[in-house]
Amino acid sequence: MKTIFALVFCCAIAVVVLGFGENEGSTIDHDQNNCKGPGSRCSNKNECCKPKDMETYTYYCGSRWDSSSGDFVRKCVICNRESSMC
């Protein structure tokens, strides 16, 4: 019982210290426009924040696997142009 209590207590402390995750709200990109950060759900590219270095990085709204819903969802992505994963 003490072990379970200690585990729950440590998890609670971790949540307080680290905070909760982003709620997919909008952020402000370097051009002072409201946009959605990487990993946020989107319906088109225009909703996503642009990378600061557009020569090295690109961005798009693409399908990604969402383990919580068990399905593919469209999310904002920023990746290196030279990467094979982009």
From Swiss-Prot:
Tree of life domain: Eukaryota
Organism: Trittame loki (Brush-footed trapdoor spider)
Name of the molecule in the record: Toxin ICK-18
Gene Ontology cellular-component annotations: extracellular region
Pfam families: Cys_Knot_tox (PF17486)
Signal peptide: 1-19
Main location group: secreted
Functional note: Probable neurotoxin with ion channel impairing activity.
Keyword Signal in record: yes
Tissue expression profile of the protein: Expressed by the venom gland.
Domain remark text: The presence of a 'disulfide through disulfide knot' structurally defines this protein as a knottin.
Keyword Disulfide bond annotated: yes
Annotated localization: Secreted
Disulfide-linked positions: 35-49, 42-61, 48-76, 79-86
Record keywords: Disulfide bond, Ion channel impairing toxin, Knottin, Neurotoxin, Secreted, Signal, Toxin
GO terms of molecular function: ion channel regulator activity; toxin activity
Family assignment from sequence similarity: Belongs to the neurotoxin 21 family.
